[in-house]
Swiss-Prot record:
Gene symbol of the encoding locus: HBB
Residues that bear N6-acetyllysine: 58, 81
The species this protein was found in: Ovis aries musimon
Job of this protein: Involved in oxygen transport from the lung to the various peripheral tissues.
Free-text tissue specificity from the UniProt record: Red blood cells.
Protein name (Swiss-Prot/TrEMBL): Hemoglobin subunit beta
GO molecular function: haptoglobin binding; heme binding; hemoglobin alpha binding; metal ion binding; organic acid binding; oxygen binding; oxygen carrier activity; peroxidase activity
Length: 145
C-alpha cells in the first residue's frame, strides 16, 4: 500500500492535524456536499442549511470522533482491516451505510486537510494521503464483501 517514505510523510503530516477542527469541517462538508448522508444524523438537530450543518455542535463532536478513529488507523497502517473491523460491522450490519459514502467521507477529509494546511498539503502528500483514506474506506466497507 504505502512505502516507508510515504508512511513517514503521512504520519508526520497527520501529527500536525487538529482533529477537532478538521474533523468538524470534514463531516460538515460530507453532510453539505452529499446531503443524502444526513439521514444518519437526523437526531443531530438543525441540518437545514450549510450554515446550520457547519455550526452544529453535534456535527463538530462527531467529526472529531470520526477523525479520532482515523488517527488510530494511522497508527496501524499495515492492518487497516483489523483496526476498523468493529466499525465496519457497525456501519454495515446496524447502520446500513452505503460503502460509497466512505469514499465521499474520504474526499471531504482531503478537502478539509487542504483547507487547513494549505501549501503544506502538496499534491504529492495528497496522493499519499489518498492512499490512506482509500485504505480506510476499503477497510470500513470490508464487511460488505
Amino acid at each position: 500500500m504505502l512505502t516507508a517514505e510515504e508512511k513517514a510523510a503521512v504520519t508526520g503530516f497527520w501529527g500536525k492535524v487538529k482533529v477537532d477542527e478538521v474533523g468538524a469541517e470534514a463531516l460538515g462538508r460530507l453532510l453539505v456536499v452529499y446531503p443524502w448522508t444526513q439521514r444518519f444524523f437526523e437526531h443531530f438537530g438543525d441540518l437545514s442549511s450549510a450554515d446550520a450543518v457547519m455550526n452544529n455542535a453535534k456535527v463538530k463532536a462527531h467529526g472529531k470522533k470520526v477523525l479520532b478513529s482515523f488517527s488510530n488507523g494511522m497508527k496501524h497502517l499495515d492492518d487497516l482491516k483489523g483496526t476498523f473491523a468493529q466499525l465496519s460491522e457497525l456501519h454495515c450490519d446496524k447502520l446500513h451505510v452505503b460503502p460509497z459514502b466512505f469514499r465521499x467521507x474520504x474526499x471531504x477529509x482531503x478537502x478539509x486537510x487542504x483547507x487547513h494546511h494549505g501549501s503544506e498539503f502538496t499534491p504529492v502528500l495528497q496522493a499519499z494521503f489518498q492512499k490512506v483514506v482509500a485504505g480506510v474506506a476499503n477497510a470500513l466497507a470490508h464487511r460488505y464483501h
